Amino acid sequence: MKGYVVCVYKSISNEEKLKEYAVKARAAVEKYNGKFLIRGGRSTSNEGNKSPRTVVIEFPSYDEANNFYNSKEYQDAHSVLDGYAERQHQTIEGA
């Protein structure tokens, strides 16, 4: 089954850092055979508070999604936003 990394941002305080993160994160996604399904874009909050940004990345398997998230490449990218974004990450196995 496929695996998905879902990141829901609660806040972003520095758009320049977000751009820097995006470049580094994209390289890690590509290395681990991921495919962006959702990367920002228009959204409507049908219930609860609206998130400023949501990202969904598909991987060939749940294990590969976890390998991506835990990789040095992605963790280096992830650290770029330390102190500049509050977010929740989940790895989810597909149906």
What do these predicted regions represent?
Residues M1-R53, P60-N66, N70, E93-A95:
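Short S/T/G/P-rich N-terminal loop/turn motif that feeds into the first structured element of a domain
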Residues Y62-Q90:
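C-terminal structural segments of small proteins and small subunits
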